[in-house]
């Protein structure tokens, strides 16, 4: 029984990922939709969505990506941040 537990422990240890990284939707240019996502580096585990808050909502353009911390809005921008996979849609 002890041998079985030891084997299960070793198998679990071998197949565990060394660290969890967040997946975020990403687009570096201002656009209406982002369909691509990236696996964020371990030091950038926050997803963000940034948009300009002026004008009609239907005409808003967005940027999305990974960040070490939630970016500060510039001018009339709004920023939404989250820390779960693909939460910045």
Curated annotation (Swiss-Prot):
Q: By what name is this protein known?
A: Three-finger toxin 3
Q: Which PROSITE patterns match?
A: SNAKE_TOXIN
Q: Which GO terms describe its molecular function?
A: toxin activity
Give the principal location in a single coarse category: secreted
Assigned keywords, A-Z: Disulfide bond, Secreted, Signal, Toxin
Q: Which organism is it from?
A: Sistrurus catenatus edwardsii (Desert massasauga)
**UniProt GO cellular component terms:** extracellular region
- Write out the tissue specificity statement of the associated record: Expressed by the venom gland.
Family, according to the entry, reads as follows: Belongs to the three-finger toxin family. Ancestral subfamily.
Q: Which SUPFAM superfamilies match?
A: Snake toxin-like (SSF57302)
Signal peptide stretch: 1-16
Q: Which Pfam families match?
A: Toxin_cobra-type
Q: Where in the cell is it found?
A: Secreted
Which cysteines bridge via disulfide bonds?
Answer: 24-47, 40-66, 70-81, 82-87
